[in-house]
């Protein structure tokens, strides 16, 4: 919930701190940059010490900077606390993917990855929705205290409910981890998935960060509550993403991703329409295509990578969140230069790159699991 919740209140923060579009983009990108930096390292560390304890510890750490955002006096302080938030997130995301890949096999992995992505989608919606409406009720500062309390409760829930790993085998050998890293960097499955991941989050962050500024401005003038409601389009992804397993089993990862990216591009084009209802439909179509792409991509790794899964997941998330960081920055420049229309053309360019990667980079084997 914490990574993108700030998008719902960006127009308010820009007004409160007299921030520019580029500064707003970097506040969003700060968390994503930290996640990109830490993902492979936390992946290696988790391979050495375990899974459940890592997830719980990361959730507990995440509580602190979330609460400290409420004390920020400048946009730069918000950026710092957002960066610290990002340091803990890979301990949740990377390790969870490795946990699923180790504890389950075959079709179950693909299905659980789809449910994992659906949960991430739901969390992304809830973070933006809650913070947007909390701002209208009690202000964004108090809203962040509520978000911190919810994160703490989440840590306690995971402590009680998540089963201890049964299949985990510790690998404390750092030299072995480096060798595994080297093999991943020349593994076509891993490299292709990493490049696709970068394109996926570039598109998602660029679109859903700056559509807020666009809809808060003339002629729409949407407030934080209305902007938070826009993110309800994420809920379509909660339904569609698990259904994507049917496509994956029938057509394979590559074909599924190609179709999903094309659908996402059509959604981005729809946001150029003037009526608000068409823009909302476009966002729903765009995000659904992105979520199916992400689900297919991480399943592609989980099914085809047998050794060093946590490190492979870490590499994927390094590229995934690096793409989001670059997306926040480049789209901020595009929006500052040519408003939403220029941002759309940039998003379409990156999605064309994703099409090329899926078409020529992925190994097109149809698998019962992938």
Regions found by a protein language model. Give the residues of each.
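Extracytoplasmic
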Residues: 1-21, 39-42, 207-213
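Helix-breaking motifs and short loop linkers at transmembrane-helix boundaries and internal kinks
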Residues: 18, 50, 71-77, 88, ...
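Conserved MFS/SLC helix-loop-helix module at the cytosolic interface between two early adjacent transmembrane helices
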Residues: 37-76
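Paired small-residue
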Residues: 65, 76-84, 277-285
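Helix-loop-helix hairpin linking two adjacent transmembrane segments in secondary transporters
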Residues: 77, 106, 114-162
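Cytoplasmic helix-loop-helix junction between adjacent transmembrane helices
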Residues: 81-122
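Juxtamembrane intracellular "pre-TM" segments in multi-pass secondary transporters
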Residues: 163-193
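C-terminal transmembrane helical hairpin of 12-TM major facilitator-type secondary transporters
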Residues: 254-297
């Amino acid at each position: 919930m914490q990574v993108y919740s700030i998008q719902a209140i960006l127009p308010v923060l820009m007004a409160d701190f007299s921030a520019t579009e580029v500064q707003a983009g970097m506040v969003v990108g700060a968390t994503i940059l930290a996640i990109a930096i830490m993902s492979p390292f936390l992946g290696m560390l988790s391979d050495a010490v375990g899974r459940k304890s890592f997830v719980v510890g990361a959730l507990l750490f995440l509580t602190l900077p979330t609460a400290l955002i409420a004390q920020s006096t400048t946009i730069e302080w918000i950026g710092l606390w957002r960066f610290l938030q990002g340091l803990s997130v890979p301990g949740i995301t990377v390790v969870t993917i490795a946990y699923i890949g180790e504890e389950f096999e075959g079709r179950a992995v693909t299905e659980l990855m789809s449910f994992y992505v659906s949960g991430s989608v739901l969390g992304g919606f809830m973070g933006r929705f809650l913070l947007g409406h909390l701002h209208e009720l009690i202000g964004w500062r108090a809203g962040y205290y509520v978000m911190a309390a919810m994160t703490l409760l989440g840590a306690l829930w995971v402590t009680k409910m998540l089963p201890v790993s049964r299949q985990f085998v510790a690998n404390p050998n750092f030299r072995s981890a480096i060798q595994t890293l080297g093999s991943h960097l020349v593994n076509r499955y891993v490299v292709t998935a990493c490049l696709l991941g970068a394109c996926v989050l570039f598109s998602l962050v660029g679109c859903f960060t700056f559509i807020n500024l666009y809809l808060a401005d003339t002629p729409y003038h949407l407030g934080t509550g209305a902007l938070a409601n826009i993110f309800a389009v994420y809920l379509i992804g909660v339904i569609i993403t698990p259904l994507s397993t049917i496509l994956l089993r029938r057509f394979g990862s590559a074909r599924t991703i190609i179709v999903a990216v094309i659908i996402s591009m059509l959604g981005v084009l729809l946001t150029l329409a003037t009526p608000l209802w068409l823009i909302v439909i476009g966002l729903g179509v765009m995000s659904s295509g992105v979520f199916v792409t992400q689900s297919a991509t991480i399943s592609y790794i989980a099914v085809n990578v047998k050794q060093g899964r946590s490190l492979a997941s870490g590499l994927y998330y390094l590229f995934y969140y690096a793409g989001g960081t670059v997306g926040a920055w480049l789209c901020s420049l595009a929006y500052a230069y040519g408003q939403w229309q220029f941002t759309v053309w940039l998003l379409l360019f990156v999605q064309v790159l994703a099409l090329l990667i899926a078409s020529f980079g992925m190994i097109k084997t149809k698998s019962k699991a992938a």
